[in-house]
Amino acid sequence: MEVGIISMRYAKALMAYAEERGAEERLYHELVTLAHSFRTVKGFCAVLDNPIVSVNEKFNLICTAADGDHKPSEEFIRFIRLVLKERRETYLQFMSLMYLDLYRKKKHIGVGKLITAVPVDKATEERIRQTAAHILHAYMELETVVDPSIEGGFVFDINDYRLDASIATQLKKVKQQFIDKNRRIV
């Protein structure tokens, strides 16, 4: 079976189960943390794919990655036990991302990422969040990242769109125009 099909089936089943139990929001926060762990912890996927690591060790690792020192919800525990029992831990990252997408669509939550060369103050960040929420008619989750390599300006990713107003991109465009112009001369 394909990764997307398996992941979507598990995510839909988890969403239905969470709705039935009234635990959608808690599960959402646990899966946000788990998805963040997949992105930031090197080797996390490799450990889950490793057949030498026992199921109990994988279970404890996943629970720690999802909720840290706190005890995860009963719904999360049952879901992880099912995934491990069916030997689908390879797809867990995609299952969590699919669940997050389903939850955000259902609850009208937009996701944005603001990349700037210098830190942005809280007032500006909140104004951007409110403006995006007003335009999208949705609640906005906004992540801010400082990346000095853009040299100035900003890059704003929102739901699958990118607004790139960075100096680095503008300089690349000017450079490309000069290269194209010189090619015509030769």
UniProtKB/Swiss-Prot annotation:
Q: Name one GO molecular function term.
A: proton-transporting ATP synthase activity, rotational mechanism
Q: Origin, by domain of life?
A: Bacteria
Classification via InterPro entries: ATP_synth_OSCP/delta_N_sf, ATPase_OSCP/dsu
Q: What is its main location?
A: membrane
Q: Which UniProt keywords apply?
A: ATP synthesis, Cell inner membrane, Cell membrane, CF(1), Hydrogen ion transport, Ion transport, Membrane, Transport
Function, please? F(1)F(0) ATP synthase produces ATP from ADP in the presence of a proton or sodium gradient. F-type ATPases consist of two structural domains, F(1) containing the extramembraneous catalytic core and F(0) containing the membrane proton channel, linked together by a central stalk and a peripheral stalk. During catalysis, ATP synthesis in the catalytic domain of F(1) is coupled via a rotary mechanism of the central stalk subunits to proton translocation.
Would you tell me the protein name for this molecule? Answer: ATP synthase subunit delta
* Species this protein is from: Bacteroides fragilis (strain ATCC 25285 / DSM 2151 / CCUG 4856 / JCM 11019 / LMG 10263 / NCTC 9343 / Onslow / VPI 2553 / EN-2)
Chain's gene name? atpH
